[in-house]
Amino acid sequence: MKKRLPLLLTALCFLLCAAPLAGCTPAEEDVYGPTEKPGYPCENDEYTYLIHPESGEVTITSYLGTAEEVVVPAELDGYPVTAIQYFTIRPAAKALVKSVVLPDGLTEIGRIAFCGSALEEIEIPDSVERIGPDAFIGTPWLDAQTDEFIIVGDGVLIGCSLSEAESGAEADAPPTEMRIPNGVKHICLSFSEEPEGTYAVFIPSGVRSIGDYAFSRMNIASLSFEEGVREIGAHAFDGALHIEALELPDSLLYIGDGAFRGNESLRRIVLGKHTKHIGNYAFSSCESLISVDGLSGAARIGAYAFLYTPYFNNLTQEFVILGDGVLVAYNGRDKDVVVPEGVKSIVDAFSGKPIESVTLPSTLRSIDDYAFSYATALESVRFSAGCAPTSVGSYAFAGCTALRTVELPSSVTRIGDYAFSECAALREITLPKDLRSLGRAAFQSCTALTALTLPASLNEIGSYAFKSCPALKRIDLPDSVYALGSGAFMGCEQLTSARLPAKLTYIPDCLFLLCTRLQAVTMPEAVERIEAQAFQQCEALEEIAVPEACRDIGMSAFAGTPFLRRLHERDGAFAVLNRVLVGYDGDASEIVVPDGVERVMTMFSNYNAYEAALITSIVFPDSVTEIGELTLHGCHSLTTLTFGDGLRIVPEIKVSIRNMQAITLGRGCAYISPNAFFFSEDNACTFVVPEGSYAARWASEKAYLHRIATYE
């Protein structure tokens, strides 16, 4: 059954609620905590979305249309739609969408999905289990909510009303009882303003997860749980507790990053028997904490989990091992360190330590976040026989400026964000044959790295993965790669050739930006989209075969390349590639964009800014359906501007109408961005608009600032 809600609240969903976990007895196969799903971006006329090949699911990332009522499809490209993120992030959608019907099977509504939009009505199916931060803040939907507890989807609590009379706001008032109602499974709660007074919070047995930041703005004098909670999200109780002792339920499996950070009164913690994961900074800055019981079962204890606590400061042994073999600190003085057998994971134990070499034990199964970060004297890492870590965490070796070579075991399948960033001496690294994911900026600023072989198992390369690796000369991406991040090879000045995966459907923004010696790129026929600045300033790139099916080419994609100059030599002033205008290089003061052009994302760049300033008139034909925000950048002398009937959305082109005489809007115009035109009271501009159209209604609202003329 779906719920059609009017909406608002004093409190509302903030950060991601966790996936549901049925039952109260933890099982070994349970999946808990947030998960990241790699995917490749796609686009149709209505949506941008990610397809996740491993799970066979789709996440919608934005709505491109202009309809007031939207029915979200249950499938895209044959895959079920299970998540929505940033749905109304685009200005047109934010202003126009008033009603949304979400499909059965949807499990997640992501952060700021409808934030600040005109949404008045929404159908949320019972399948929804997660609702992210600020998902509905600033919408009429929220403003209409009157229930004390607002519960949607599969028992997701997104808000509650706490009046001053109920809040125990008086200085001597006892804590106000806050009992989460029965039927709630997931608490995705936060408040637009900090509730006054103190509270006694009771979490009943039906609750399975507490979302990020859920109680972080409250003052809690008492907190009690019944068995059942499996997950506490990031910063859920950050700075909120005014208690000395905390006992967590045995059902609890996962404690997120910073979940209990900064609770200065907290002296003693008793963890549940089944707690497996304690996130980064989970109990950091609990300045009174002296006792932690129940750590023995924890397989993962995050970086700096107990930083700035008396409890951690009193752990003075050479190797501080907590939980199930987690090395959290090294207090020794040896420069050549042999980590003892029995250690299964290493977090920030060697961060900033003056060690020169380390030998890792056969029992090691993960190198976690910040493990050796900024150990600037570290030259070598040895893996004992049988040592089989499956992952290298974020910042694990970041800033290890003396590290020259690394041969990772074949067991490693994931390298985290910034894992080897700023390893300035790193010349060679052997990547494991089963590696599947390279994180964001994983090798950024490895200035000595000349070559590496990417394994055939690799699926995902994060944004800026090899940014500013000036010695890297060649890169071959295996055909297994389907997710490629922005600027992955940006600033690789010595890179001369690159081969892209055969099934890659897009070239991400800034991919080869400032690769000044890049001469040859093998682009697959599957590519349908080249994003902004993808090849900008590739000063040696004279030829590149762009597939005919590629009709979406972003702003300045080829700016500053010989390839663009050759297009101008072939086409004249207007460089057109697959019906996309990719550049203008002429000296006329009045411009008529050629008929047949469908997209205009770039006309003028820094190289012809002078010519842009001389333009007095531009006409876009009916064939143009999209223009970029910077299309008219630098056109300070414009007096007339004409948009054809094909343009649906006038983006934030930021045109001043002070000197304008006439602006003509076409019949297809469905939305004009707030910053499309800058108005002033002393102007003589006339807006020429179709009778009875959206453009006519828009112009009439600002009639005191300009003149209006209509046409049929």
Model-derived segments and spans:
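Sec-dependent signal peptide cleavage junction
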Residues: 18-37
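Short secondary-structure subsegments characteristic of cysteine-rich extracellular domains
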Residues: 86-92
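Acidic, glycine/polar-enriched metal-coordinating patches/loops
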Residues: 677-680, 702
